[in-house]
Amino acid sequence: MSEMTPREIVSELDKHIIGQDNAKRSVAIALRNRWRRMQLNEELRHEVTPKNILMIGPTGVGKTEIARRLAKLANAPFIKVEATKFTEVGYVGKEVDSIIRDLTDAAVKMVRVQAIEKNRYRAEELAEERILDVLIPPAKNNWGQTEQQQEPSAARQAFRKKLREGQLDDKEIEIDLAAAPMGVEIMAPPGMEEMTSQLQSMFQNLGGQKQKARKLKIKDAMKLLIEEEAAKLVNPEELKQDAIDAVEQHGIVFIDEIDKICKRGESSGPDVSREGVQRDLLPLVEGCTVSTKHGMVKTDHILFIASGAFQIAKPSDLIPELQGRLPIRVELQALTTSDFERILTEPNASITVQYKALMATEGVNIEFTDSGIKRIAEAAWQVNESTENIGARRLHTVLERLMEEISYDASDLSGQNITIDADYVSKRLDALVADEDLSRFIL
């Protein structure tokens, strides 16, 4: 897991997300507390439970982006789910237990990649030997068995040197590789995904591991052989246990759109996709044991981060038991014009940088001036105020409209320099922004 300090985590998030310092600090502290807990003795470690977080804020202010970036920083099993995809147990739809199953699958993949990387050097050696065995077959005795030579022959050493220097990369060889498993696609109704995956793995394992001769260039064969040899060096049982430990001790679940499962007013009949889902989430967040195809997983120390816009519902509309299990509340602020200006310029891969790079592929040099950036930000904020406030996503809409003409004619503008200043922006957007009916449908 990540050993970054809260300050370092916030600094990394600052490269991609503008503002929302309180939310960044909360997730940074929560992530660091995962590391701190692992430094305690076993008895005390078991007693320290994660403090789950509820992020509240209008759409388009960075809630989901914080989750995306956190996933890359955490170096721990992480999954992001939409609360609206689930229904109460016993009804058509996904059960909330599938969150932990998917998290465990993600952990197995992550641990497998780490194990393969750890064994990569040994796998490269074994792959090299297999290619050399094809180029220079080892000597055999009278009974057709391969003789174990004490010292590699001079010819083998010469070929090894050429292989490492890349002189043989384009030479074709025929080599035996593991055949792809039997492809079986099973369609199942919603909620039966676990049974489907078990049936698929059963069919794929039928017939054992078969070898298939393939003709490949040496550089391509080397890549496939390294993967094959690395996979052989990994112990599947150890891998599963390591993955389950990683989920139980370091797992993070991000539940988006949790406000959409709040109960709205008085309704008759079962509320299977709202309050029913909240009730099913309770044992997961509180701590229970979930059965997965890799083994039993305890959820006592998994960190849950929930987020929602809460424009119609309020956090108090969640059932009280779930509110109590999300003790840390973070409110994200609506974005201002100055925030929009910073979003257009400060992130490592800001929207303006992306558009400049896209147009550069056609030989068109785009330059955004400070006045142009300011006018784009003002236009986006103005449309948000007069219609629906969709936060930073409005910048994509405004910029796409602004760049439409250049994008269409880019192939004819090769070699030209185009400056986008306040006048350029006003000329193309002012009429749309001023007309509320037009901006409602176009911007």
Swiss-Prot record:
Where does the protein end up?
Cytoplasm
Q: Which domain of life is it from?
A: Bacteria
Q: Which InterPro entries match?
A: AAA+_ATPase (IPR003593), ATP-dep_Clp_protease_ClpX (IPR050052), ATPase_AAA_core (IPR003959), Clp_ATPase_C (IPR019489), HslU (IPR004491), P-loop_NTPase (IPR027417)
Q: Which residues cross the membrane?
A: none
Q: Name one GO cellular component term.
A: HslUV protease complex
Matching entries from Pfam families are given as: AAA, AAA_2
Q: Which Gene3D superfamilies match?
A: 1.10.8.60, DNA helicase RuvA subunit, C-terminal domain, P-loop containing nucleotide triphosphate hydrolases
Q: Which UniProt keywords apply?
A: ATP-binding, Chaperone, Cytoplasm, Nucleotide-binding, Stress response
Provide the residue positions that the database annotates as binding ATP. Answer: 18, 60-65, 256, 321, 393
CDD domains, alphabetically? RecA-like_HslU
Question: Where this protein primarily resides, as one coarse class?
Answer: cytoplasm
What the entry lists under SUPFAM superfamilies is as follows: P-loop containing nucleoside triphosphate hydrolases (SSF52540)
Q: Name one GO biological process term.
A: protein unfolding
What turns on this gene?
By heat shock.
Q: Name one GO molecular function term.
A: proteasome-activating activity
Q: Does the keyword Nucleotide-binding apply?
A: yes
Fill in the subunit field for this protein.
A double ring-shaped homohexamer of HslV is capped on each side by a ring-shaped HslU homohexamer. The assembly of the HslU/HslV complex is dependent on binding of ATP.
Matching HAMAP family:
HslU
The record's PANTHER family line, in alphabetical order, gives:
ATP-DEPENDENT CLP PROTEASE ATP-BINDING SUBUNIT CLPX-LIKE, MITOCHONDRIAL-RELATED, ATP-DEPENDENT PROTEASE ATPASE SUBUNIT HSLU
- Record's function text: ATPase subunit of a proteasome-like degradation complex; this subunit has chaperone activity. The binding of ATP and its subsequent hydrolysis by HslU are essential for unfolding of protein substrates subsequently hydrolyzed by HslV. HslU recognizes the N-terminal part of its protein substrates and unfolds these before they are guided to HslV for hydrolysis.
**Entry similarity comment:** Belongs to the ClpX chaperone family. HslU subfamily.
User: What's this protein's name?
Assistant: ATP-dependent protease ATPase subunit HslU
Organism, scientific name? Shigella boydii serotype 18 (strain CDC 3083-94 / BS512)
Q: Which gene encodes it?
A: hslU
